[in-house]
């Protein structure tokens, strides 16, 4: 499992990724992510690329396409962008890349997530770094988005109605 972060605010996330079992983490503020991926994989690249960078623009998707060195690899994107100028369709075709769009979740995905939570396999308390009451929903949202006037270093916020 590889975990790549794109912003300096994500250093705490890199540490959590290590604790949750990531084999490698890449801080893109300190190293070239593609070069590091190629080093980790012995120049082979990855079989699957997951774009989990909501609102990050096109760069993470382009990185994923470049990192897919094996023909017939797969890339999973959130697809939040209304447009993608100069999308590298030729490279997708040449490499036989299949693109999957992940938006929302299914009933089965919720069941699997609940099973993971119940298994206590991962210390998920490391991921939920802050708890907010309902009166602080706006602050919670701004904090997760790292907005001005927000709480710093929030990886994930949980809303607790009784707080």
PLM features: residue spans?
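Adenosine-nucleotide cofactor-binding segment
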Residues: 1-63
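Glycine- and other small-residue-rich loops at beta-strand/loop junctions that grip anionic moieties
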Residues: 6, 26, 50-53, 78-79, ...
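Short, structured coil segments at secondary-structure junctions
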Residues: 20-21, 71, 95
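A short acidic, amphipathic alpha-helical/loop segment
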Residues: 60-67, 88
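Residues in the short beta-alpha loop(s) of Rossmann-like NAD(P)-binding domains
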Residues: 9-10, 81, 105, 159
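ADP-ribose/adenylate-binding Rossmann-like module
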Residues: 48-51, 68-84, 99-100
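C-terminal hydrophobic helical "lid"/dimerization subdomain
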Residues: 31-32, 62-65, 107-163
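Rossmann-fold NAD(P)-binding glycine/threonine-rich loop
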Residues: 78-96, 108-113
